[in-house]
Amino acid sequence: MSKLIKGIAASDGVAIAKAYLLVEPDLTFDKNEKVTDVEGEVAKFNSAIEASKVELTKIRNNAEVQLGADKAAIFDAHLLVLDDPELIQPIQDKIKNENANAATALTDVTTQFVTIFESMDNEYMKERAADIRDVSKRVLSHILGVELPNPSMIDESVVIVGNDLTPSDTAQLNKEFVQGFATNIGGRTSHSAIMSRSLEIPAIVGTKSITQEVKQGDMIIVDGLNGDVIVNPTEDELIAYQDKRECYFADKKELQKLRDADTVTVDGVHAELAANIGTPNDLPGVIENGAQGIGLYRTEFLYMGRDQMPTEEEQFEAYKEVLEAMDGKRVVVRTLDIGGDKELSYLNLPEEMNPFLGYRAIRLCLAQQDIFRPQLRALLRASVYGKLNIMFPMVATINEFREAKAILLEEKENLKNEGHDISDDIELGIMVEIPATAALADVFAKEVDFFSIGTNDLIQYTLAADRMSERVSYLYQPYNPSILRLVKQVIEASHKEGKWTGMCGEMAGDETAIPLLLGLGLDEFSMSATSILKARRQINGLSKNEMTELANRAVDCATQEEVIELVNNYVK
C-alpha cells in the first residue's frame, strides 16, 4: 500500500526513482582525550583546515558552473569562515594551552560561536551560525578521517531523501542520476530549494518526517508541482505519474518554441522579459531562454571569492563580455551591493547588529570612493560595446542619487580627457527597495531615467519581516495590498515623467504576481533565466485590459489571501 507525504513544492517537475537516504556520518570522538604532542595536534588541525579549503573551493567552482555565481556565493562565505582568525586562533590556543585534542578544540570553540550568533535577534547573524556549523562539520570530518556524504558519487537514478541538504550537498548533485530530492525541513527560500530550481531538479522540502517514513531503496515519487511524495506507489499511481512526467517534459519542449517569440498580450500590449545574472558564466542560460535583455547584473560577484579588489581592467573585461554577448539588448548593471548578507574579507567592514539597515550598497560606495570610482570607470569604458544602463542600489534619498550621479559624470569627463570613447546613451536609474524611496517616487522620477523595483528587500522592509526567518515567514507577503500599492505608485510616477519601471525581485517571475504586475503597468520583468519562457507563455495568454481591472481591484483588497483568491478567480 502506498503512503502520501505532504511537503512544500520547492522546484517543479516529477521524479520517479528509488530512495537514496543521506546517512549522517559517525563523527563521534573522545572529548576528554588529552594530547602530548601539542605541535603535532595543531598541525593536524591546520591540515584539516587546508583540506577543507581545497574541498570547498572545488565545490564552489562546480556550483558556479552549474548554478551561477550568485548561488555559488554561499561557499565564499564558508571559505571566509576558514580564514577568520577570530575563530581559528582560539582553537589553536585551546590545543596549546589545554592539551585538548583537535576535535574537542574545534567543537568547543565553534559551539560557543554558534550559541552566541543564534542568540542574537538578527537573522543575518543566525545565518552566520549555520555557516560556522557546516564548516565545522567539514573540518571535523578531516580531523577524524571520516568521509562526508558525497552526492556526486551517486551513479544510479535516485531520489535523495534527507533531513536537509546543505548547500554543498546540493551543489554536488549530478543531474544525470539525481532525479529529485525530498527533505524534512526547509522552505521555498532555503538554499537547497533555490539551488534545486537552478538545477531544474524536482524538489519537496518541509515534509517534517520523510526520513522516518522512507527506507533505503523504497520506490518514491516526488511531485514538485503539488508538494506530494508518494512512497511505494501502486501500479496505477506509477502509471499516472509517469504520464504526468511525460506531460511535464512535453510542456517544457513546447515552451522552447517561444524562445524567439515576442512577449505580447492578446490585446497587443508588449512586455519585456529580462534575466538576472551574477557573472558572464550565466550568459548561455540567458540566451538559451530567449531573454530580451538583462534586467539585473549583480556585480558584487566580481568582488567575492578573492583576497583583493578586482582591478578596473578586470571589471572592464567582464562588463564588455556581457554587453557584447547581449548584442545591443539592454543590460542593466547594479553597482556594488556589498554589506547586509554579503561581506568581503579584504574590506574589513565593521560588524553591525542590523547589517541589512546599515553600512551597505550605495552608502558604502559613496563613503569609500576608492571602491566606487574604479567600477564606474570600468562601466563607462565598456558602454561603447552595447546598450548599458547603470543603477544604484539601496538609494534612500534623492541626495544619494545626486551624489552618485555627480561622481559618475566626473569620471566620465576624466575618461574623455584620457582619450576613452564613452557612450552618450547610458541611462541612470535606482533600485526601489526602501519604502521611503517608493513614497517619494514622484520626486525621484523627475531625475532618474528608470526604476527597478527590488521586491525581495522592499517586502521585508515594508512588512518588517525578515524573509530568512521561519518564525515570521507568514508576514513575508508578496501579494499584500500594501506592496501592490507601493508598486503601483512607483510605476505611475515613472510613467508620468515618461520613464520606465522594471522589477528584478523573485516576484517578477511569480505566476500569481505576473497578472497583477502586468495590470499595474510594469514595463520590464527581470527573473531567473529558467523562468522566462513560462512567463512569456503566461503573458501571451493574458489581456492587458482585464489585468488592469484585476490590479485595480487587488489594491483595494485588505489581505494577501483576498488578493490570491481574486487572481485565481480571474486567471483560470
UniProtKB/Swiss-Prot annotation:
The residues annotated as the active site are H191 (tele-phosphohistidine intermediate), C504 (proton donor)
Q: Name one GO biological process term.
A: phosphoenolpyruvate-dependent sugar phosphotransferase system
Entry binding sites for phosphoenolpyruvate = R298, R334, N456, D457, R467
Q: Which reaction does it catalyse?
A: L-histidyl-[protein] + phosphoenolpyruvate = N(pros)-phospho-L-histidyl-[protein] + pyruvate
Which positions bind Mg(2+)?
E433, D457
Q: Which GO terms describe its cellular component?
A: cytoplasm
Q: Which domain of life is it from?
A: Bacteria
What PROSITE patterns does its record include?
PEP_ENZYMES_2, PEP_ENZYMES_PHOS_SITE
Q: Which cofactor does it need?
A: Mg(2+)
rRNA processing listed as a keyword: no
In which compartments does the protein localize?
Cytoplasm
Which Enzyme Commission number(s) are listed? 2.7.3.9
Under the heading Pfam families, the entry gives: PEP-utilisers_N, PEP-utilizers, PEP-utilizers_C
EC category: transferase
Q: What is known of its domains?
A: The N-terminal domain contains the HPr binding site, the central domain the pyrophosphate/phosphate carrier histidine, and the C-terminal domain the pyruvate binding site.
Q: Report the function annotation for this chain.
A: General (non sugar-specific) component of the phosphoenolpyruvate-dependent sugar phosphotransferase system (sugar PTS). This major carbohydrate active-transport system catalyzes the phosphorylation of incoming sugar substrates concomitantly with their translocation across the cell membrane. Enzyme I transfers the phosphoryl group from phosphoenolpyruvate (PEP) to the phosphoryl carrier protein (HPr).
Show the PANTHER family listed in the entry: PHOSPHOENOLPYRUVATE-PROTEIN PHOSPHOTRANSFERASE
What assembly does the database describe for this protein? Homodimer.
Write down what this protein is called.
Phosphoenolpyruvate-protein phosphotransferase
**Organism in which the protein naturally occurs:** Staphylococcus aureus (strain N315)
**Gene name, please?**
ptsI
